[in-house]
Amino acid sequence: MMKKNLYSLVLVLAFCIIGSSVYGQESVVLKYNFKEGKTFRMTMSMNTNIVQSMMGQEMKIIADAVSKSEMKFTKVEPGGNATALVSILSISAKTSAMGQEKEENKSDFKKDGISMVFSPSGKVSTKITDTTLSSIESISNMKFFLLPVKEIKIGEKWLDKQIDTMQMQSSNPITFMTTTTDNEYTLAGKEIKDGKELYKISYTGTLEITGKGKQSGMDLFMEGTGQTVGFFYFNPSNSMVIYSESEAEVNTTITVTGQQNMTIPMSQKVKTVMTLEEV
């Protein structure tokens, strides 16, 4: 009897190990499979807490913004590159600083939208935009998480490095800004969200910021570093990232030289939530 029980126990353990091994080998191809004629609506919310010191005084700023954008894929090339017409639907922003609050809401955007070309990795290869967009409209800059465009096993990690240079709005004293990010991604596993079986990808990363500009005849130089942590869900049924959450902490210093020399340290904490729905 004891031998029989031991034999049964060995079989159970063997099946458990085999089952665990099979699950561990499960994989998915992580890339965007854009379809011509498909339309998606993106909602992005950002909560930003800023602490800035200047001339011995500390100033705290809290900003909340919500943007809604819509993108319609009008053309998909044989290699997978897709052209999308991106339209900003609405943006609302609320800022609190020095005991005062300011609200800004806008929904009367141009209907012709912005033409963007995305690769299967989610990278924007071409962007034809309107240079008259205001600073509040720049909040809705639509970007996708970059995917490795290959088969990834659950538990597997991969690295990604991005360098983005932005030409800032004319109202911003910083003329341009370059951001370098290094991220490590992990295919964490499967989860059920809103009745859908999704793949969860978690990530951590570091970033470096440099920029320069002019104001009132003085030169401005900006440097900063930060850390990010977050996750997003990939829906294999439509090959799109449909939800994400991220938190970032960034410390920057703006150095002013010219008629007056000073340094302005600033720390930021930003939480971003994104949802993408097919319409």
Enumerate the predicted regions with their spans:
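Signature of exported/secreted
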Residues: G24-V279
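Bacterial N-terminal signal peptides that target proteins for export
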Residues: M1-L11
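Bacterial N-terminal signal peptides
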Residues: V10-G19
